[in-house]
Amino acid sequence: MKRLRNILPVLVILGGMLILFYPTISNFLIMRNASRAVNNYDASVEALSQEQYQKVLDAAHAYNEKLAQNDAGETDALASAVNSASTDEEYNSLLNIDGDGMMGYITVPKLEETLPIYHGTSEKVLQSGIGHLEQTSLPVGGASTHAALSGHRGLPTAKLFTDLNLMKKGDKFYITILKDTYAYQVDKITTVLPADTKQLAIEPGKDLVTLITCTPYAVNTHRLLVRGHRIPYAPQQQDDAKSTFHVDIPLQYLLPSLALIALLIAWHLWQRHERRRRQSGSAKVASGDPDSADIEPDGDLPPQPDSTNYQSHSSRRKGPGRHVRPA
């Protein structure tokens, strides 16, 4: 029992550390899985023959042309940007070369992230990557296209689009589909209500992509839209665009965890000090130290005898009127 009592503070501190670094560890694991998904995607694309590659790309462009003819964009896609799984078989088959729903990936240098892009915006998709909003253009470039990509913000398990609000006009992001990479430069940042989908409309002749996340942080009553227009792509532009791992602990986890750990450490140190003080007192008594002879092992004075009782006892022994007989 005593051993358990000594180990308990250490276990609690370790538990607090795990809670403290849970967001960072979880984000690291998700980013590692995202990196694997990107590498697997690139390998699958490389395995395509030229004929297969062209067939997949042509089908995506044909889909976009049909959307443009139907004036797509003014839809309820933005309002259903969360928990919306696609049931359209044609849509789900496009750009889906591995059958896992991944159509490509996006790299945002400002956020230091490279994330897979999946069909639809179901909760399962948004927990691990970026979702493409159905009824918006597929992100394969071209005139009169407007793709919309949605990502979660503020998840305790992953960053994703948590820092999308840091994007400024002029920032760039890159979308890789099959063997092609498309560069976009931010030109418009707006905040709208979930039902306001006008900002997603296709604009004739323009090649646009809008990144979407919830706002304000942890309130999520509105949508933050970061729009970019197509610019020429040069490979060296993406040199600083690789994702990096860094410690990122939200304050709502950091401050309480640090306070708890500090209290537990202080309590453990006090317990150790008290234990040593008692052991020191016991050692002095056992060694016959005259300075500690009257000190109990726990540091307290021993109980003193009652002087009244002592005197009464002495009087009874002598007895009243009795004298000591001379030798």
Regions inferred by a protein language model and the residue ranges of each:
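Compositionally biased, intrinsically disordered low-complexity regions enriched in proline and serine
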Residues: P23, D42, Q54, L254, ...
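C-terminal single-pass membrane-anchor helix
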Residues: D240-D291
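Cytoplasmic C-terminal tails of single-pass
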Residues: R276-A327
